[in-house]
């Protein structure tokens, strides 16, 4: 969305969240890291962001809601940002310990970010009618986008994986702002890839050519499965499928989601598990004796490297779960192999 507004000559500032949070300014290609205090990410940092927007005399801000807790989402929207265009990308099973326990609860929590007397962009899905009612209560115009109208030929123009959902949402934002579709489509093509963008890389091991996909940024099973399905549709040459699942001790709910909604639903030959609090994965894999399961919790990283190289033979290596901990090092290691 930032690149679309920039393409249309807006003085736009963008701010991303997550591990590699950045500031983007319309007048430079350089991206500036968000310097955080010792306590880490905090919605209070939004005050500094707004000050920078004002100082630069920008006329647009594209900003992710960094709050997960519903109460913090209310504060983020009503007190810190006051966005006049809200965007709800999807309702998925992530952070269920805070937003759940059901998807209906997640949808309800997201209503905190719907503006009053503004515009709301949502996807055409099972929650469209629910958000429509909430938008009407707040006198906000609803813009519903449909991923099925995005042509595959456009998606193939990017040098990284792009999903029709994302393109549809950005076109909805363009409509809300008043940017024509042609400008919006070109703006997306001109956009620098997000740090979490899914790229496909070849690497050699055991005298064979292997395919590597870093899907750590997806964070939850539904998006991860969508990425895997997309990769499989491209018919890359491989005879073996290796899943690397990296777990976090402070995200055991996320690990459980992958156990419940991913490991038993997708096809693979080998599961390599790294990180911490992997017990539930081990318990599940005891019910899958036909698959090779290797657990590296508590082991030296050099053992993980050797294990990956040993298994990579005409293989697709697909990384999922969390980038924190060994995840980032695993991605760097494989990306460094010719």
Task: State what each model feature region is.
Residues 30, 153-165, 286, 305-315:
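Short, surface-exposed amphipathic charged segments that create phosphate/polyanion-binding patches used
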